[in-house]
């Protein structure tokens, strides 16, 4: 039986190819979302370049409606990279609080129809986009904050930081090998939950 899986995230969900300066994507055959699109899963990719954790009521409402109307049996949410990258003074704990507010709204609207898998992105590494060691240290705290959030909300959690996801030269975006490793990690997480 083919189930719907909605993947809600940023450029790493979108499939951004960091070798492209104009927002290009990896071929579909490379993207982790497409690798999960099998006879078991019909994957809906709702990744967007530059997306951060939603904070405005209108943005949250639109996202919640997208998730609810998809009627997906499972929803993977992976955000937070842009928050920490673009706001150097932002603490990982604040990302956790923002994520909790967003996911509370999702849970109210979906009323348990969808299994939510909150996924902490793999930590950034020094690269063309990442030079401040403080940003990298904060990123290493994000998984713990998200795990606490998931526990409080009673939803599933996965830490992509333990999946060996290779990042490209910029220290932020998945390489082709990274997409494959991430797809395997998500598949394992979903298999253990459903």
Predicted regions located by residue number:
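Glycine-rich phosphate-binding loop signature in dinucleotide/nucleotide-binding domains
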Residues: 67-71, 110-111, 193
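Conserved beta-strand segments of alpha/beta enzyme cores
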Residues: 42-44, 114, 154-156
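Substrate-gating cap/lid alpha-helix
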Residues: 123-159
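Residue-level recognition of beta-strand->loop/alpha-helix junctions
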Residues: 45-47, 119, 159-161
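Histidine-centered active-site loop/cap adjacent to the catalytic His
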Residues: 170-194
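Short hydrophobic segments within beta-strands
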Residues: 8-9, 118
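A short helix->loop->beta-strand "cap" motif at the edges of active sites that frequently abuts
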Residues: 107-115
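Conserved SGNH/GDSL esterase-like catalytic core that processes O-acyl groups on lipids
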Residues: 2-6, 12-104, 127-129, 137-141, ...
